[in-house]
Amino acid sequence: MGPKYVFITAIIGVFWHVQGFPNPGIKQDKAVHNRELSEERPLEEQIAEADTVSRGTSKENQEMLKNDSFADELGLLMSVAEKEGDVKRSGSVRSSVGGHRGTLDDADSTKNLKPAEYFDSTKSMLDYKYEDDPDGLHQLDGTPLTAEDIVRKIATRIYEENDRGVFDKIVSKLLNLGLITESQAYTLEDEVAEVLQQLIANEAKNREKEAGDLDYAAVRSDVYDDDKQEGKMETRNKNEDRESSETKNEDSFSSKERRNELSPEEDFDDLQYFPNFNRLIKSLNSENDAKEKKTLITIMKTLIDFVKMMVKYGTITPEEGVNYLENLDAMIAVQAKNKLGKSFGSHKSILSEDKNVDESDSTKQEAAKMEKEYEALKDSTKPEPKDAEDKDKPKGKAETYLEAIRKNIEWLKEHNKEGNKGVSDNDLSKLKDFINQQADSYVEKGILDKEEANVIKRIYSSL
């Protein structure tokens, strides 16, 4: 009987402390109380209540995650194992639970309300695309992420930020939390490195493909333009052939005209030191004399270069070279006067004013001597030009000047530093080689025509 009484006493003690339904502490009007139970509250009150609840629940999470930029990756890796393990188990239950939840949510209108952050325009709408997946464990189509997807996501993050420190921070936190071991960390590093290398290779291929597409488009555009113009070009072939022949003739004429338009000062810098030669060039001012003037300038320059070469090799002294060039200019005046019938001034105007009287006399004597030698060696069978037209022919001027060059070479032989022994065959060979090189260079530069160069070569080869 003792235990029976004890059991009855315990039951009475339990029911003694049981309370009934609570009564309102404050007396309310019966109509207000019934309205709260039967009618839905105003929308403003529901929004305010939902806002208060949302702020209270998310405040602690925001405090914990605001200083950690990699919280999404950590949360993703920490919960991926549990998520993947429960996917199959929760697949069948989700439909029934979802349907039941939908019924409850429909009954409670506060469940459909969005948090205050949802209406904030500064936040991305992607953050609320999957509200039941805060860790980003689902893809865009809603399917859960696999381990390969997680590795690819980490590799993509490293590739976009171009920083390997992202992986180091994630692995160090996983190791500190004890979620992975060191061997798993090495395996994860190898997998991420492989995916990262594949991303880089794909990016390189895409760039090459884009560059190839641009080149192909440019080539196709050129081909299209060529095909478009081909029909027009065929109709104008005959006209272009005729125009091309005319253009060639005009180009040939313009090139010669352009060379003739060059002033003597541009072609011959040392012209100022030869006043008689300068007068001779200025006298050839007609169109027929343009080619002759160019030839004379070229020959004079070649002769000066030859004198410089002789001085360089020591064949003559610098004083003898200067004397030779002065007598050359004086002889030009004398022979031009005799052959062409033109006076280029007295010998006093030819020589420089800085020369003394003795130097002027010696120059005059030398010029007179050379004139006598020329008269003695002159071909007596050749008739003298009598008509003014014959005197003004370019051919006569060229022959006169070339004969003067021969006489100057003979004078150079006699005034060699070795006395009257003359110039050796070696010197003449050097002279011929030098003249040939100069003539070829003038042809390449466009100063002389090929025919003019051949004439000069032929003259010096006959010395």
Curated annotation (Swiss-Prot):
* InterPro entries on file: SCG3 (IPR026197)
Query: May I ask which residue range the UniProt record assigns to the signal sequence?
Result: 1-20
Keywords assigned by UniProt, alphabetized: Cleavage on pair of basic residues, Cytoplasmic vesicle, Membrane, Secreted, Signal
What are the annotated GO cellular component locations?
A: extracellular region; transport vesicle membrane
Q: Which domain of life is it from?
A: Eukaryota
Write down the membrane topology: Peripheral membrane protein
Query: Where is this protein localized, as stated in its record?
Result: Cytoplasmic vesicle, Secretory vesicle; Cytoplasmic vesicle, Secretory vesicle membrane; Secreted
Q: Which PANTHER family match?
A: SECRETOGRANIN III (PTHR17388), SECRETOGRANIN-3 (PTHR17388:SF2)
Biological role: Member of the granin protein family that regulates the biogenesis of secretory granules. Acts as a sorting receptor for intragranular proteins including chromogranin A/CHGA. May also play a role in angiogenesis. Promotes endothelial proliferation, migration and tube formation through MEK/ERK signaling pathway.
Q: Assembly and partners?
A: Interacts with CHGA. Interacts with secretogranin II/SCG2. Interacts (via C-terminus) with CPE.
Q: Please give the name of this protein.
A: Secretogranin-3
